[in-house]
Design a protein with these regions (language model features):
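Active-site SXXK
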Residues: 37-44, 65, 104-132, 203-208, ...
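Short, conserved phosphate/pyrophosphate- and ester-handling motifs at nucleotide-, phospho-/glycolipid
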Residues: 32, 113, 282
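Short, gly/Ser/Thr-rich active-site loops of penicillin-recognizing serine hydrolases
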Residues: 84, 295, 309-316, 326, ...
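Glycine-rich phosphate/pyrophosphate-binding beta-alpha loops
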Residues: 272-278, 337-349, 363-368
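A short, well-structured edge-of-sheet supersecondary motif
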Residues: 35, 41-99, 131, 157, ...
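Short, contiguous pre-domain boundary segments
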Residues: 15-28
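Short, well-structured active-site flanking segments
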Residues: 68, 75, 95-103, 115, ...
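Short, surface-exposed loop or secondary-structure junction motifs
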Residues: 6, 13, 77, 82-88, ...
Length: 392
């Protein structure tokens, strides 16, 4: 295994084989142990008490090939329901609760978009997909996107002009859902940023049309299986952290307390496999994903992307990835940090400038979603990692 020395500046770029993750001390990772101790303590504090930020959480952080923090806090399942009349959570008896562990899978929500984006860039690398090609060249039956000249790049950068979402969960069947997607025109000016789940749904259809394979197969065969991410897949996932007592009026469907079934209503309506949501994973598996991208697309003997195409992913404004967003990246933002958040409480950040990564998975929607999400704990955790680098 290559030594740690020199890995931080290079990130493993250009290596035919990149080192795998291994557990180690903060000092071995080149991180300040005091800051990481505070990171862990704060995650525990935010899962404690009567009204915690999240019922439970898993935090994973490291630098280079060294995994320096892997900690679980709180509960994977704490609540039986949400009481609408009293506006309070209904606690399970202590014996019926399920503790959080570092191996607990989470509903990734929009972190799924990162895997869809990597799958797309893999096809760009192979020459089967053109980044500036028009969607209509691959999906002529998606008449609205074809008529307005929407491009693959616009889907990946959320600049297609498509609205944030459609009520696919209210459609009678798959045929009606597909007809709605095919007929949906941009409502904004193409080239203007507007975050939209529809971009990734159209991209899913492009990928499936180009390859003749379903998205779950593309992700499994092209990303998770080569990297040994055995805990990452589309649901159902029975052992996952619970999400929401999903009921109207605060949600868009009446499904009750969810555990192991995709939380996103549109992904659920689409059968659990969707370009914008549907994956489940663990903190360690996502650390492998981050490490692979930091190492230029390689992990051990596996290579999922070439270094130039990892660069393409992270070229501003980013393909699928958000870049330098302090609202959830804290002080890691500023030198090309990349990442994403998920509605269920998930997030990850990787910083190529310092060869560091942070995965924070929390079930913040258990037992009910907040009206306004609280992103401060995500930013605070990332700031701890940034300071752990600076103080070494």
């Amino acid at each position: 295994m290559p030594p740690l020395e020199g890995a931080y500046g290079r990130g493993g770029r250009g290596l035919l084989s990149a080192p795998r993750l291994r557990h180690g001390t903060p000092e071995r990772a080149g991180l300040d142990p005091g800051e990481l101790h505070l990171l862990v303590r704060e995650v525990h504090a935010r899962t404690a008490g009567e009204r915690p930020w999240a019922a439970g959480a898993v935090v994973v952080a490291g630098r280079g090939p060294v995994l320096a923090v892997q900690e679980a806090a709180g509960w994977a399942v704490r609540y039986a329901a949400y009481d609408e009349e009293t506006g309070t959570a209904v606690e399970l008896p202590p014996a019926a609760r399920v503790p959080m562990t570092v191996d607990t899978p989470f509903d990734l929500a929009s972190l799924t978009k990162l895997f869809t984006s990597v799958a797309a860039v893999q096809q760009i690398e192979r020459g089967t997909l053109g980044i500036d090609a028009r969607v209509g060249a691959y999906l002529p039956d998606f008449t609205a996107a074809a008529r307005h000249g929407v491009t693959v790049r616009q889907l990946l950068t959320h600049t297609s002009g498509l609205r944030p979402e459609l009520p696919l969960y209210d459609c009678a069947d798959d045929a009606e859902r597909l007809a709605l997607l095919r007929a949906e025109p941009p409502v904004g000016v193409p080239g203007t940023y507007c975050y939209s789940d529809l971009n990734m749904l159209l991209l899913q259809h492009v990928l499936e049309r180009v390859t003749g394979r379903t998205l779950d197969t593309l992700v499994r065969d092209g990303i998770t299986r080569p990297l040994g991410m055995t805990a990452t897949d589309f649901g159902p996932c029975p052992g996952a952290a619970a999400t929401e007592d999903q009921r109207r009026p605060w949600a868009k469907a009446d499904r009750g307390m969810l555990r192991g079934e995709v939380h996103d209503e549109n992904a659920w309506a689409l059968g659990g496999v969707a370009g914008h949501a549907g994956l489940f994973s663990t903190g360690r598996d996502l650390a492998v994903f981050c490490r692979t991208l930091l190492a230029g697309g390689s992990y051990g003997p596996a290579r999922i992307l070439g270094p130039d195409f990892v660069d393409l992913l992270f070229t501003p404004p980013g393909l699928g990835f958000a870049l330098d967003q302090p609202w959830f990246m804290g002080e890691l933002a500023g030198r090309g940090a990349a990442g994403h958040t998920g509605f269920t409480g998930t997030s990850l950040v990787l910083d190529r400038a310092t060869d560091t990564y942070l995965v924070l998975l929390a079930n913040t929607v258990h037992p009910r979603r907040r009206r306004v999400p609280d992103n401060a704990p995500r930013a605070d955790a990332a700031t701890r990692v940034a300071r752990a680098v600076r103080r070494t």
